[in-house]
Structure formats: C-alpha cells, structure tokens
Amino acid sequence: MARVKRGVTSRAKHTKTLKAAKGFYGRRKNTIRAAKAAVDRSKQYAYRDRKVNKRNFRALWIQRINAAVRESGLTYGRFIDGLNKAGIEVDRKVLSDMAIHEPAAFGALVEAAKKALEYLKDAGTTNEFETAVK
C-alpha cells in the first residue's frame, strides 16, 4: 500500500482555520493552536447566541407592545387576552411593527381587544362573542 502524505490536507485545514480567525486579537489570528481554540469557542458562542437572539427579540417586541398599549389604558397581558378572546391572531413581531409604523391600525386592534374584554365581562363565553362579532 502506498504511503499517503498529509501535507496538502493539513495546510488546507490550517488555512481554513486561520481564515475563520481573521480579525481576532493577538496570537489567535496567527497561531494554529490558538486560532483553532478561538474559532471553536466562537462557533459555540454563535450557536448559543442564535437561540438567545430569538428570546431577546421577543422581549423587545413585548416591551414595545406594552408601551403602546399602556397609552390606551391597558396592560400587555390584558391586551393579549383581549385579542385572544376576540379571535384575532397576530404575532408579536407584527404587533410591535404596527405599534411603531401604523398607530391607527394598532389602535383599532386595541379597541377590538377592549371590546372583547368588556363583552365577555358582561356575557360569559367566548363563542357568543365570536358569533356576535362575525
């Protein structure tokens, strides 16, 4: 069996690692051993932070919705409850965007949520409200 030299593949792997470490500080961008550890760690952080990013954006959307809804005298939780009871299904990202860019449309949703909360306080069940609204 012929002998296999690994110089070409090793150089390619090293080049790939050093290319990924571009912009790192100090030895981490020059030395294979340090660069490999830094790149591995950076990939772990990137994986973790892709999950954290989703949580952070959801929290931001909720804060924006809460701020916009409080101007109308509701809290975020009551507003979401009212939307659910009114049968309106809009996600938080869209609600946040509407609160910033289309306040009139967002105000209509707030009024629908208030109406649903008031109606259900008087009547009783969600099904009656959905038939009354339609």
Curated annotation (Swiss-Prot):
Signal peptide: none annotated. One of its GO terms (molecular function) is structural constituent of ribosome. InterPro entries: Ribosomal_bL20, RIBOSOMAL_L20_CS, Ribosomal_protein_bL20_C. GO terms for biological process: ribosomal large subunit assembly; translation. The keyword Secreted does not apply. GO terms for cellular component: ribonucleoprotein complex; ribosome. SUPFAM superfamilies: Ribosomal protein L20 (SSF74731). Keywords: Ribonucleoprotein, Ribosomal protein, RNA-binding, rRNA-binding. It holds the Pfam family Ribosomal_L20. NCBIfam families: rplT_bact. Binds directly to 23S ribosomal RNA and is necessary for the in vitro assembly process of the 50S ribosomal subunit. It is not involved in the protein synthesizing functions of that subunit. Belongs to the bacterial ribosomal protein bL20 family. PANTHER family: 39S RIBOSOMAL PROTEIN L20. This is Large ribosomal subunit protein bL20. The gene is rplT.
